[in-house]
Amino acid sequence: MQQITDLERTKILQNGGEKVKPTFSKEEMTRRNTRLREYMAKAGIDAVMFTSYHNINYYSDFLYTSFNRSYALVVTQDKHVTVSANIDAGMPWRRSFDENIVYTDWKRDNFLYAVKKVLNEGGFSSGRLGVENDHMTLDLRRQVQDALPNTELVDVSQAVMGHRMFKSDEEIDLIKNGARIADIGGAAVVEAIREGVPEYEVALHGTEAMVREIARTYPHAELRDTWIWFQSGINTDGAHNWATSRKLQRGDILSLNCFPMIAGYYTALERTLFLEEVSDRHLELWEINCKVHRRGLELIKPGARCMDIAAELNEIYREHDLLANRTFGYGHSFGVLSHYYGREAGLELREDIETVLEPGMVVSMEPMIMIPEGEPGAGGYREHDILVISENGTENITKFPFGPEHNIIKK
């Protein structure tokens, strides 16, 4: 009689399917992995074991769903294999750029058994193994070290983040489509705004519009993770506040935040709006924030330092005694990221980031101030555009208008 312990620990599971149409060309994915392997050779790293959503997706075109299971992408000079859980069956192979191996649930250490098997097949039994210190847990690190005792674990997270910060033409095309779809979501949000409508209904209407357009534009893609934060009144105080059942009221400050997700890539549209009317103090604060936004758009160009952009914009807020009302940095890089993975922290418009803007980078301008509840003009004010930096300057790929001339919504 067959026992659970008799079942195989790993398997190659294609399930009779074929590879799906990839997000990017073979040439693009080869370029990314060639650059990775060149870095590995230069740094004396024999193999890399990626564990994060963003790096596995960036180098393999497969975005996993963890549900407390482990996933990996193992890369050597000769092997490129995603390691996925049996619960996903053949989907990871269909979506992976290269090979895939499945580990089963039947023994607790099957994940590392599969990783070790791939490494051994790639000629690695000892040496320097690249890992992501900013993602790998202490428990997993200990388990890897126990499974590979003659291995030195070397952090590669910062180096590969530097690779991801520069976008290829294919990536920029996808990001431009994302910005276009975010604008569609924004228009749908405005369409749904009415006094008495709850926040979540507005968010749902915009999300549906974006998902449908992603499906139309990328019929081969998984449809996942697209969302909207739509906030009203006091709920606008935090940029990352989720929709609630609060019903919109006349005179409300509103915050529209649309995030279409395409194959793990993030784009965004964020706008301040008012319902029907705006008080004098609200209008004054809104116009100040728009002034900062406009100046920020002018400052983003090749050769500018992130910290210098932040410093100049701080002066505008300081002139109006609003510097202390800022809530976060002025912008960040775009690419493979979401609210639960990614973030290219080396490319953010903050006072402590010395990075110089270069062609191939894609960044946002998104100033925000928050006035506490109970004070005149209370609420959160935020505008957000996406800019592509090239040899010739910058291109603003966000088309949705901002400011009082456009976004006092009258129904």
UniProtKB/Swiss-Prot annotation:
Keywords: Hydrolase. InterPro entries: Creatin/AminoP/Spt16_N (IPR029149), Creatinase/aminopeptidase-like (IPR036005), Creatinase_C (IPR039394), Creatinase_N (IPR000587), Pept_M24 (IPR000994), Peptidase_M24B (IPR050659). One of its GO terms (molecular function) is creatinase activity. Its EC number is 3.5.3.3. The keyword Hydrolase applies. It catalyses: creatine + H2O = sarcosine + urea. Signal peptide: none annotated. Gene3D superfamilies: Creatinase/methionine aminopeptidase superfamily, Creatinase/prolidase N-terminal domain. Belongs to the peptidase M24 family. Creatinase subfamily. Homodimer. The active site is at H240. It is an enzyme of class 3 (hydrolase). Induction: By choline chloride. This is Creatinase.
